[in-house]
Each structure stands twice: as structure tokens, then as C-alpha cells.
């Protein structure tokens, strides 16, 4: 019977972790470029691993999609924690909003499958990620509102819906990034303090 030393075990675990990260990176890129129907063999090949390695980490396509989606949410959350310390909360919010667009460029290729999973047995997973995303948006909005840069009647759910609306109508495969970012800037300008508030919200 072969005995694996502690150092060898650590090396194997580190190698497995690197493979997982690489698979997620390649899946993220290919989902954005081709959609969720992308061949899993192509993803494994791009990551430089065998298909068996992919299935060990992600037994089903749904598992891989969820992992990519979760990684994007975590990245947006982490970015909000970095940006919240900025001396310019308004510009920090704008930068986070632009990062949200990049996230949606990936998610758009997975929308149909994600919606199916949201309504099925994976719905609990999405409640957690939705809460994480809303907390990140609130984290970015609060200091900007407190600094008098952003209107006080803006709420995180509304911001997320506005950004989501932009992204769902801006397919990264056919819409120039500059056009999408221009729309994000228009939304940001509408959020700024001093912008007109509709009569229904006064």
C-alpha cells in the first residue's frame, strides 16, 4: 500500500486547488464568449486538464455554472470592501457599477440555466448570493449618500435592477463595451445629488 507523506498531500491539495481555479477562469471566459452550452471538453482543454479532473471538481454542468456565478458574486462583494475605503465614495460607486457590468457579461451567457435553477432545488443557493449582492450594493451606496454625492432616495434593490436592465440588453458579443459603460455613467449621473426627484417620491 502506498503511503502519501504530509508534504506530498499538501502538494496534491495545492495542485487540485490550482486546477479548480483554472477551470473556473476558463469556464468564465468561455461562458461569456459562447454561452453556457460550451463544451465541457473545451473548458477542460483550455484549463490544461483532463475531462476527468473537471468532473471531479464539478460533477455536473449546473455545478460548474453555480461555481462560476458564485465566484463572480464573491468578486463583486470583495471589490466593494476594497472600494468602500476610498476617499471619493462617489467615484468608488461608479467604479463598482462598472465592475457589475463586467460580471453580467459573464452571467448573460448563463441566464436561461440560472433562471431554471433559481426556480428549482437550487433556489436556496440564490437567496444567499442575492443577499450578498444587495449588501455589497448597500455598502457602496451608503457612504456616497452620506457624503452628499448620491441622492438619498436611492435604494440598493433599485440600483441593482437598473444595472441588470442595462446588462440584459447589452450582449457583450454584439454591443461595444464603450456603449454599455456610457449607459452605466448615465445611470450614475441620475443618482447624483441634485438630480431631479420624481413627484411620486417626494
Predicted features by range, described:
Residues 1-46, 63-66:
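Basic, helix-initiating cap at the start of DNA-binding domains
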Residues 16, 69, 73, 126-134:
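Amphipathic, non-transmembrane alpha-helical scaffold segments
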Residues 39, 110-116, 149, 153-154, ...:
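Short, hydrophobic secondary-structure boundary micro-motifs
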Residues 95, 101-136, 165-173:
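Short secondary-structure transition hinges
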